[in-house]
A protein has these predicted regions:
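RNase H-like, Mg2+-dependent phosphodiesterase core
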Residues: 1-192
């Protein structure tokens, strides 16, 4: 990597849940930026992630966050939706090199690397994971305010026992991903 090369890193939050959006974030820092508090978002408390969100957005040279609705995920599938969002951010990034967390970007017209467990190995991928997770968690809290009986602020849309019980009791909402097994099953049984 030459001394003038700049790198952007991309990660996502929300591939596994059965409700809520997919959020993909990209971030670019000044070369040599470091911060020991930034870590894989899954290893941090909600309070630490929130504080780091502000730090990251203030310190970044550039960042972008995309929120992709459930209907798009259902139409295209989660893998394709994730890859297309990462490609969009990668194209927009004012950089020469792009790192992604375990997602190949073969059609990208920039140098790229897919890093397995990148949010554990790269500070900038970890920063992108924090931006994505905080944005998605905030979205799920708003859904929880609209539909408190579903418990979205607790399970964040993942198919927990409590979430499946809420689906059984109250039915499928627009925010549920109809292409995901538990929701498909519910639609077939109850025809919501």
């Amino acid at each position: 990597m030459g001394s003038t090369s700049r790198c952007s890193s991309i990660d996502e939050a929300g591939r596994g849940p059965i409700a809520g959006p997919l959020v993909v974030a990209g971030v670019c820092f000044e070369k040599g930026f470091t911060n020991e508090m930034i870590d894989d978002s899954k290893k941090l408390t909600e309070k630490k992630r929130e504080a780091l969100f502000s730090l990251i957005t203030n310190e970044a040279l550039w960042y972008q966050i995309l929120v992709i609705e459930e209907k798009i995920i259902d139409k295209k599938n989660i893998y394709r939706t994730t890859q297309e969002a990462m490609l969009e951010i990668a194209h927009n990034a004012p950089v020469d090199i792009v790192l992604s967390d375990a997602m190949p970007l073969p059609s990208l017209d920039k140098e790229w690397e897919s890093v397995i467990k990148g949010d554990q190995k790269s500070l900038s991928i970890a920063a992108a994971s924090i931006l994505a997770k905080v944005t998605r968690d905030r979205y799920m809290k708003k859904l929880d305010e609209l539909y408190p009986m579903y418990g979205f602020s607790k399970h964040k849309g993942y198919p927990t026992k409590a979430h499946i019980e809420a689906l059984n009791t109250y039915g499928v909402l627009d925010c549920h991903r109809r292409s995901y097994g538990p929701v498909q099953k519910m639609l077939e049984i109850k025809l919501f």
